[in-house]
Amino acid sequence: LEQNYNYKVVKQFAIATVLWGVVGMLVGVVIAAQLAWPALNFDVPWLSYGRLRPLHTNGVIFAFGISGLFATSYYVVQRTCQVRLFSDRLAAFTFWGWQAVIVSAVVTLPMGLTRGKEYAELEWPIAILIAVVWIAYAVVFFGTIVRRKVQHIYVANWFFGGYILAVTLLHVVNGMVMPATLTKSYSMYSGVQDAMIQWWYGHNAVGFILTAGYLGMVYYFIPKQAGRPVYSYRLSIVHFWALIFTYMWAGPHHLHYTALPDWTQSLGMVFSLILLAPSWGGMINGIMTLSGAWHKLRTDPILKFMIVSLSFYGMATFEGPMMSIKAINALSHYTDWGIAHVHGGALGWVGFITMGSIYYLLPRLAGRTNMYSTQLVDLHFWVATIGVVLYIAAMWIAGVMQGLMWRAVNPDGTLTYTFVESVKATYPYYVVRFAGGTLYLAGMAIMAYNTWMTLRGRDVPAATIPQLKAA
C-alpha cells in the first residue's frame, strides 16, 4: 500500500463535488425563481426564500466548494510530496465526517435552525463536528507534508496549507457561542463587536476558502494541463505572502456606513485596495503560464475552463477593491450589485477552476486518458459561460439601478421612488438571472452525466509512487 498513492478518498470527494454542485446550484435556481415569482414559496415554511438561501450558500461553499478542495488538495499533496496520504483512516473520516456535516445542514437549515450569521448559520453541534473534521484534515495534510520525499514544498501546498490554517482560526473565533439548547445558541459577542467578528470571518471565508484554496488548484492543474511551468515561481511566493498578510484586514468593507467606527471602515477599505496587487499578481502569473501554449485553448476545453476562471478572478478582484471604496459602496451596498460581484467570483472563478480541476482528475481516477466525452466538456463550458455572463450582467444593471433609485430625491427633498417601485423595476432582471442560473445548472448536469460515464464500471487504478534515486 505504501508504494501507491491514495486515490480512493480523492475519487470520493471528486464525486461528492459533482453531486453537491448539482444540488447546491439547483437550490440557487429555485430561490432565483422565487425572487421573480414569489408564489413558488408555496406558503410552505421550509421552502421559503429565507430558509433556502442559507442552504444554497452553504451547499455551494461547503458541499461543492470544499469537497472540491478536499479532492484536489489530497491529490496535489501526494503527487508533489511523492508520498501516500498520512493516514488512510483519518482521510476516510474527513470524507464521511464532511458528508455528515452537509447532510445535517440540509436537514437543519430548512427547519429554520440557524445562528443567523452569514456563512456561519450551522448551529453549534454541527459547528463542533466541522471543527473535528477540520482538525483531522489538517493532520492528514500537514502529516503528509512532514513525511514528504521531496525537499521542496511546492507552492500549491502553501496555498492549501494557508487555507486550512486560516479556516481553523476563523471557524473557531466566529463560532464562540453559548448554547441554550441543542438547537439554539447565542453569540459570545454583541453589538458592533459581533458584527466585526462576523465580517472578519465572512470576508476571509471568501479570502481563504474561495481564493487561497483555489489558487492551490491554479498552481498545480494549470501548469499540468498546459504542459508549461509556472510563469514566475518567485511571483507565486511573493503573492502568497502578500495575500496572507492583507486579506485578514479587509473585513470591515462589508460594514461601510454602519455603526462600525469610521477608522475601522477606512482601515478595511485601505487593505481592500492593497489586495488588488497580490490578486492580480496571481492572475497574471496563471495566465502567463500559458505562454507558448495558447494554441491549446482551441482544442482543450479543460484549459478553457481554467483560463476563463482566471479572467473572472481578475475581474472580481478588481471589482471588490473598487466596491470597498466608501463613495462607490454608498451606491452599491445592499443592492444586487453585491450579488453580481459574488457570483462573478463564485460562478466564474471558483466554479470554473473547480470544474476544470475535477475534469483533470476524473480520467486519472478511472485509469483513462480522457473524459468519456470531450465534446460534452466543451458544451458544458459554453453553456456555463453564457449562464455566468447573463447572471452577472443582469445583477450589475439591477444593482446600479436600485442604488440610483434609492438615492433619487425630488427638489423638495422627498424620495422620488418608494422602495416597492425599485423592487418592481428589478423584476425583468430577476428573470434574466434565473435564466443564467438555469444555464449554469444545466452545465453542471452535463458534467454529472460525463462523470458517470467516465467512472462507470472502472476501479481506481493503482498509482505507484515514483522511486527517488539517492543523489
Model features per residue range: what roles?
Residues 188-197, 332, 337-339:
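Active-site-proximal inter-transmembrane loops
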Residues 43, 115-118, 258-261, 329-333:
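Membrane-interface helix termini and inter-helical loops of multi-pass transporters
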Residues 297-299, 303:
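Long, amphipathic alpha-helical stalk/connector segments used for oligomerization, subunit docking
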Residues 11-39, 43-113, 124-145, 157-182, ...:
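Hydrophobic cores of alpha-helical transmembrane segments in multi-pass integral membrane proteins
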Residues 1-12:
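Cytosolic juxtamembrane amphipathic/interface segments immediately preceding
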